[in-house]
């Protein structure tokens, strides 16, 4: 410990003590005042959904216990103004410095700029760190014209990065910084992250998930040692242990992406040495996923409007169909397409979906129903346990053809064919659509083609206990083609001659 500075550590989505650059720097320099500030009003339209708030509540309780074991105390504050709360903490503690780790979503970018500005005005030192990415967004010069190049570079960087020990160990001990004046702190319960009506539903989450940074470490080790080797093979399955389940831990910063990268990269090197092709392929695929996460932050950092506008300018003229009844049917899993409906019902029940299913249901909303992609993005934000604004923005823009490297806008994937590919035995369908459980596998992904005798024997009555298709595939393709033509016509009419540079 080189000095005895008084430092406030502002926790946000970095709820861990291991590999936390802001906490490590503050602990090295002197006494520490850890604080988490909850300001619902500032979240605006991106106020976290029920499942996400439940996770945050559990994670904060876990972090509080960990900091207490190190001799410190996490101060929790609920406020109408983050800036005011931080300034109150500075006055109460006599702190001369505030540190935190970067966030890259549109809400945080604006808030962080304001906080830094107000603190500097008052002569308070401010330092922010990269605690969320393998690579800093500032490493790339990003324009709309080179988005694909940036994606390729981030993916390649994650495959080629050295495996040096960049993970910071937890502090052995923290020197607490006491507040001379009263700070209006509260308990985890008083933050209001969970109301009484939500608790019965959240009890189901408790059975399936264990939030907290030390639990994240266990999940990572389990995945790396037992499941990573089959990751590529299992990526085409939507049932069983086919994903890492790390995304909520990464979103809340309970484990650092550098730690995840380091573990996977070490396995990749070992498998390459041993000429284990299956393992190498799996590690490569997983590391490219880490690169995609970095890419989402790089794009949001350079184009903070992406939660509201398409990155490709001509798609701003696409004639989306703002049909609330279709949107409701999609949300409730009543589209008549089993794989889509199973995914949406799983989402509502658990706050979770396999990434492959996320792509399928979002593509259906955008391409089959022509629903505004921003509607789907917002619904994912409201319901996903691991709702991550940067990843969701890029995911929905990708599906809607709004990225240079995204799905072609005219690409229409048949959910029945995808069902046969990713759920060949119909296990996933039967789990989430019990009304179709008795239907033979031959028909389970396209019950509208099944003979009436088969439907009757299986207890299925289309239009009664299971929906008829909300739109016929040929009709959906025709409507999509017309919408694309109208987009091009509108672009020509107003003189939009291509991408903005």
From Swiss-Prot:
Lineage: superkingdom: Eukaryota
Binding site for FAD: 231, 243-247, 386, 388
GO CC list: cytoplasm; nucleus
Bound cofactor: record note: Binds 1 FAD per subunit.
UniProt record, GO biological process: circadian regulation of gene expression; entrainment of circadian clock by photoperiod; nucleobase-containing compound metabolic process; response to stress
Cysteine pairs bridged by disulfides in the record: none
Domain Photolyase/cryptochrome alpha/beta span(s) in chain numbering: 5-134
Name of protein: Cryptochrome-1
Cofactor dependency: FAD; (6R)-5,10-methylene-5,6,7,8-tetrahydrofolate
Binding residues annotated for ATP, in chain numbering: 356, 405
Family the entry assigns: Belongs to the DNA photolyase class-1 family.
Pfam families, per database record: DNA_photolyase (PF00875), FAD_binding_7 (PF03441)
The protein's role, per its UniProt record: Mediates blue light-induced gene expression in addition to its role in blue light-dependent inhibition of stem growth.
Keywords: ATP-binding, Chromophore, FAD, Flavoprotein, Nucleotide-binding, Photoreceptor protein, Receptor, Sensory transduction
Gene that specifies this protein: PHR1
InterPro entries linked: Crypto/Photolyase_FAD-like_sf, Crypto/Photolyase_N_sf, Cryptochr/Photolyase_FAD-bd, Cryptochrome/DNA_photolyase_1, Cryptochrome_pln, DNA_photolyase_1_CS_C, DNA_photolyase_N, Rossmann-like_a/b/a_fold
Subunit structure as annotated in this protein's UniProt entry: Homodimer.
């Amino acid at each position: 410990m080189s000095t005895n500075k008084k430092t406030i550590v502002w926790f946000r989505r970095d709820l861990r003590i291991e590999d936390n650059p802001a906490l490590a720097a503050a602990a090295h320099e002197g006494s520490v005042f850890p604080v988490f500030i909850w300001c619902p009003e500032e979240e605006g339209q991106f106020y976290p959904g029920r499942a996400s708030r439940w996770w945050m509540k559990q994670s904060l309780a876990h972090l509080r216990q960990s900091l207490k074991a190190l001799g410190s105390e996490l101060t929790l504050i609920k406020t109408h103004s983050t800036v005011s709360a931080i300034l109150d903490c500075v006055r109460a503690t006599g702190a001369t410095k505030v540190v935190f780790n970067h966030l890259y979503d549109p809400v945080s970018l604006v808030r962080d700029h304001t906080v830094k500005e107000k603190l500097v005005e008052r002569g308070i030192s401010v330092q922010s760190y990269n605690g969320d990415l393998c690579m800093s967004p500032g490493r790339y010069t990003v324009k709309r014209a080179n988005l694909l190049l940036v994606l390729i570079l981030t993916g390649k960087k994650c495959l080629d990065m050295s495996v040096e020990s960049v993970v910071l160990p937890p502090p052995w001990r923290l020197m607490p910084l006491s507040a001379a004046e009263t700070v209006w702190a509260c308990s985890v319960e008083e933050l209001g992250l969970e109301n009484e009506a939500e608790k019965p539903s959240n009890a189901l989450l408790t059975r399936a998930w264990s939030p907290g940074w030390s639990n994240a470490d266990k999940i990572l080790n389990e995945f790396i040692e037992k499941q990573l080797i089959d990751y590529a093979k299992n990526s085409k399955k939507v049932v069983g242990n086919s994903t890492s389940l790390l995304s909520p831990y990464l979103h809340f910063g309970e484990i650092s992406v550098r730690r995840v990268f380091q573990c996977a990269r070490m396995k990749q090197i070992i498998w390459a040495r041993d000429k284990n092709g299956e393992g190498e392929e799996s590690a490569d695929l997983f590391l490219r996923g880490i690169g995609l996460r970095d890419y989402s932050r790089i794009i949001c950092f350079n184009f903070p409007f992406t939660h509201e506008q398409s990155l490709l300018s001509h798609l701003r003229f696409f004639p989306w169909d703002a049909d609330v009844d279709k949107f409701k049917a999609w949300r409730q899993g009543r589209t008549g397409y089993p794989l889509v409906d199973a995914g949406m019902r799983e989402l509502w029940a658990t706050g979770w979906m396999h990434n492959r299913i996320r792509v399928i249901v979002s593509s259906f909303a955008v391409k089959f129903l022509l629903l505004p992609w921003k509607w789907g993005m917002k619904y994912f934000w409201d319901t996903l346990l691991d709702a991550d604004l940067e990843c969701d923005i890029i995911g929905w823009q990708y599906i809607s053809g709004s990225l240079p490297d995204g799905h072609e806008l005219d690409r229409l994937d048949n959910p029945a064919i995808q069902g046969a590919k990713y759920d060949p035995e119909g296990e996933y369908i039967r789990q989430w659509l019990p009304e179709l459980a008795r239907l033979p596998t031959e028909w389970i992904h396209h019950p509208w083609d099944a003979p009436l005798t088969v439907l009757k024997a299986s207890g299925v009555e289309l239009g009664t206990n299971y929906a008829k298709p909300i739109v016929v595939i040929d009709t959906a393709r025709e409507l999509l083609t017309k919408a694309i033509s109208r987009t091009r016509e509108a672009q020509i009419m107003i003189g939009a001659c291509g991408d903005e540079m």
